[in-house]
Amino acid sequence: MSMLPSFGFTQEQVACVCEVLQQGGNLERLGRFLWSLPACDHLHKNESVLKAKAVVAFHRGNFRELYKILESHQFSPHNHPKLQQLWLKAHYVEAEKLRGRPLGAVGKYRVRRKFPLPRTIWDGEETSYCFKEKSRGVLREWYAHNPYPSPREKRELAEATGLTTTQVSNWFKNRRQRDRAAEAKERENTENNNSSSNKQNQLSPLEGGKPLMSSSEEEFSPPQSPDQNSVLLLQGNMGHARSSNYSLPGLTASQPSHGLQAHQHQLQDSLLGPLTSSLVDLGS
């Protein structure tokens, strides 16, 4: 390791300082450290130094400088996730300033389509909402095994997928919510189908759901008025008198037929008299 001229640090030491300051969130101090570096092309082309410059440029809102750094140098795959976040977040911020409102999911998708990741920080693999299919495959496989990973397991998944722990946590939370919603929808459809089946079974096959008519006409006959009841009673008594084999009061079996007819007229008068009086009273 050779010391940098008039600086006192080796290139590896400079890279280590950049990484430590980034991880500690000391971005202003990192910016001052980068400004103090000597004008050495070999040093300024170091990937850790370039990444540190990109982080400082984003922190200060110097997005043009950020884009220039990311597009001008080929970065190693292990640095792609961090630099991709810087690229996308910078374009999101610029779009929000132009529109004057925060971006939703559709707005962010349009920004990603308009400003695709440069190949210097992207290996060309298709991504879905900034997640590579390979990373999503790892998460899906783990979800099938355990939908509730522990904090330690989330950190391990983040390292394996190149995502942050927050991204991993959000992915699992969103996936659980989608599965619960799908289960609730399926349960609702099943209950609706069962309810429809039960109602169909209760319907009469002949009457389309209407109750079968009773064979007894009396249940559905209209109520008879007092007058109608009296007339029916009279007709029944008269018919009974004609067909009965018993002797009527005051008559013998040997009486002539005209005597029987006269007695029937008397019987009608005796029955119709009170009935007529009742009808007159009801009508008055």
Swiss-Prot record:
Keyword Oxidoreductase: no
Biased composition (Basic and acidic residues): 179-190
Lineage top rank: taxon: Eukaryota
Keywords in alphabetical order: Activator, Apoptosis, Cytoplasm, Developmental protein, DNA-binding, Homeobox, Nucleus, Phosphoprotein, Repressor, Transcription, Transcription regulation, Ubl conjugation
CDD domains: homeodomain (cd00086)
GO terms classed as biological process: apoptotic process; branching involved in ureteric bud morphogenesis; embryonic cranial skeleton morphogenesis; embryonic skeletal system morphogenesis; epithelial cell differentiation; generation of neurons; inner ear development; inner ear morphogenesis
Keyword hit for Repressor: yes
PTM comment text: Phosphorylated during interphase; becomes hyperphosphorylated during mitosis. Hyperphosphorylation impairs binding to promoter elements.
DNA-binding region: 124-183
Location within or outside the cell: Nucleus; Cytoplasm
PROSITE patterns documented for this protein: HOMEOBOX_1 (PS00027), HOMEOBOX_2 (PS50071)
Major subcellular site: nucleus
SUPFAM superfamilies, alphabetized: Homeodomain-like
Any one cellular-component term (Gene Ontology): nucleus
Protein name: Homeobox protein SIX1
Species assigned in the record: Lagothrix lagotricha (Brown woolly monkey)
